[in-house]
């Protein structure tokens, strides 16, 4: 119910189909349609294939962390944990994914996108090829780097599974460039990008926008205790324990969160202006340099990843 306060919402569902599921845990298109029609503030729909922090892994929300409101919203029976398996049951291959996306778009009338961590690139080649040949597919793609954060993932996943954002995004973007369809997709970056320099870095790689999670949580008091799944969050951010929730004062924390967003935007605008641009989307891979392997020299992202974002090429041509 806190979503009904005026903000626009991207409704995301993953393998558990929480909020849009049948009693057996399968996806319910009827419930999604009903949800969208009843809540006009839902502006986009996002299908989470995987997340960068734990790609391919299953997850659980323990029953002791679910209030009655959460249980009803998710569609979970009393006394049961909320389980999200490591795979989708509504589709099993690329063709079925595209059909699934188009069906949701048709019956909701909303933009539909996908969020995914990156591993093998074979499936991305297949996806790009079939998007081009069928003229169907997602309106936007969220590339979630391995830096993506969660307090509930296994350490082995967080530390070793998945590809970091810059490598992941550049690899996928170049595949779509190869098929000439990168301009048909809105690109969103995710994974520890909530700092001014990282925002510009992501824009230079070709992102149209970024997602922010961890940094926003830090602004309201998260101390990265990684106890989210234990219901013992000491700062009150990720717990249903009433006593611990007292550590989170909404009136105070909302101001701090607002300050964070304002300062982030301010810093990005100032850096952009200092570099001679009017908008951060004007940055290209040629503008960002990083230390090379020996640490004694610099290399531009353009040379490292061997591409320029198409939108930047068009801007340069128009200028």
Regions found by a protein language model. Name each.
Residues 68, 74, 86-89, 155, ...:
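Flexible, active-site-adjacent loop/turn segments at secondary-structure boundaries
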